[in-house]
């Protein structure tokens, strides 16, 4: 193996390691949100991080304010009512010490008004209801060899241009890289 082969292999391995670390960061969001883990949330956002939930819901700036979302009484009630965040597999666009991640997020909850139904070998359930589906855009920065969230934007999938544009941007970055 030549030095250039080794350097190329090392560069490719670094990309794989970065993507795995980012997948883990993104995959940690649903369990942290669904358990109200403010400490965990604080550990993954930058001090001046931004949490943007679009034009119809409030957001937050700063790690303490973002972490406080998971401690709100309304969020705690949603958890007790069967809240679950279900994330789709993310597209990751790496650019040195920055990355943009684009994915979907479904917010589902136990359907307390649903009729109980039996599924063989899985018991009875009233089922779940999809409350909202959003486009989820994460802007990440590597700090001290660790990926951190600088900004997170959530826009509802409602057919309007802003969420479609977030999806196009995420897909476009991947398309350009693979061209």
Report residues per predicted region:
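Acidic/histidine-enriched, glycine/proline-rich intrinsically disordered or flexible terminal extensions
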Residues: 162-179
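Short, P/G- and charge-enriched loop/turn segments at secondary-structure junctions
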Residues: 76-80, 121-128
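Short, hydrophobic/aromatic alpha-helical segments in well-folded domains
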Residues: 25-28, 40, 44, 88, ...
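Short, surface-exposed loop/helix-turn segments at secondary-structure junctions
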Residues: 113-125, 167
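Short, glycine/acidic-rich beta->alpha junctions
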Residues: 21, 82-84, 131-132
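A solvent-exposed, acidic/Ser-Thr-rich amphipathic alpha-helical stretch
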Residues: 38-111, 116
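Short beta-strand edge/turn micro-motifs at domain boundaries
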Residues: 98-102, 124-128, 133-166
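Short, low-complexity N-terminal intrinsically disordered segments enriched in polar/charged residues
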Residues: 1-31, 35, 43
């Amino acid at each position: 193996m030549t030095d250039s082969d080794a350097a190329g292999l090392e560069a490719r391995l670094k990309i794989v390691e970065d993507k795995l670390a980012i997948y883990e960061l993104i995959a940690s969001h649903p369990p942290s949100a669904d358990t109200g883990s403010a400490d965990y949330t604080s550990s993954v956002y930058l001090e001046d991080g931004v949490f943007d939930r679009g034009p119809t819901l409030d957001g937050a700036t700063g790690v303490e304010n973002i972490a406080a979302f998971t401690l709100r009484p309304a969020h705690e009630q949603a958890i007790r009512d069967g809240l679950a965040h279900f994330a789709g597999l993310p597209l990751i666009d790496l650019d040195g010490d920055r990355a943009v991640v684009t994915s979907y997020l479904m917010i589902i909850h136990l359907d307390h008004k649903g009729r109980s139904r039996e599924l063989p070998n899985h018991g009875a359930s009233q089922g779940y209801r999809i409350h909202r589906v959003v486009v989820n855009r994460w802007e990440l920065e590597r700090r001290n060899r660790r990926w951190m969230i600088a900004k997170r934007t959530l826009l509802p999938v409602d057919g309007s241009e802003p969420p479609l544009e977030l999806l196009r941007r995420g897909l476009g970055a991947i398309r350009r890289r693979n061209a």
